[in-house]
Amino acid sequence: MAKMTTIKMKRLLEDRLKNPEYRIVYKRDDDALRIEWRDSGQGMTVSLPNLITKYNNRGDIAIQEMEEHIIEALKIMNETHHLQGMEKHIFPVLRSPSFPIETKAGKKLIYKDHTAETRVFYALDLGKSYRLIDEELLKEEEWTLDRLDEIASFNVRSLSHEVKKDQVADNDFYFLATQDGYDASRILNEAFLEEMKANAQGELTVAVPHQDVLIIADIQNKMGYDILAQMTMKFFAEGRIPITSLSFVYEDRKLEPIFILAKNKPEK
């Protein structure tokens, strides 16, 4: 594989994204490429060093994926979206409290607090991608937050919740990873958590390290907490959209963060 440089990557993207309606600007100070619509100025900025790292690890597929992501993102920015008639395509998504509450265009996103470690935003599913719902869109449709939340909550309950089980040191770990974009969102399905709680032999704990996984653990001994902590940290570090490296105890229909040092102390 030939060594990839910033200039080579810049030219490669410019060639792949040729479109008379796009404006492509190289931002030398940031070592980034800005791709935007000529008429509206809406667009996205790509860090060239980050893309080169992905290319070095994965080859041409990394560039192909970035090209598809840019085209899809710009397409969404240029479309008019409605909530009415799209009720079945509205879902809640979990994010960390540090996630921006405004878009780069200055639109305020709709969200509600979930736990000290998580917030719930709302997504309009568009097939290959989704758009986070903002105040302006909600106002245009004359919807309330309560109505939006009710619809999103209903839809997340309709998603499958088949899990894969793994037993480690007499503790049961269940993984939900369908890759549909809403794996972590299933933590909001209270009926599902209640079912898991009813069948648990020990303490039921839950983790959402990143958007594409939900971990449920039936902890039956002290070593289980240590395993869960290490597991959650690993998933958090690898996640495309990380949420939290902490896990939660599920008790009395509430989620309480548990602070675990990844160190197993033997009982005296």
UniProtKB/Swiss-Prot annotation:
InterPro entries in the cross-refs: DUF1444 (IPR010838)
Coiled coil: none
A Pfam family that the UniProt record links to this protein: DUF1444
NCBIfam families to which the protein is assigned, alphabetical: PRK13668.1 (NF010189)
Family membership: Belongs to the UPF0354 family.
Protein name: UPF0354 protein OB2234
Protein's organism: Oceanobacillus iheyensis (strain DSM 14371 / CIP 107618 / JCM 11309 / KCTC 3954 / HTE831)
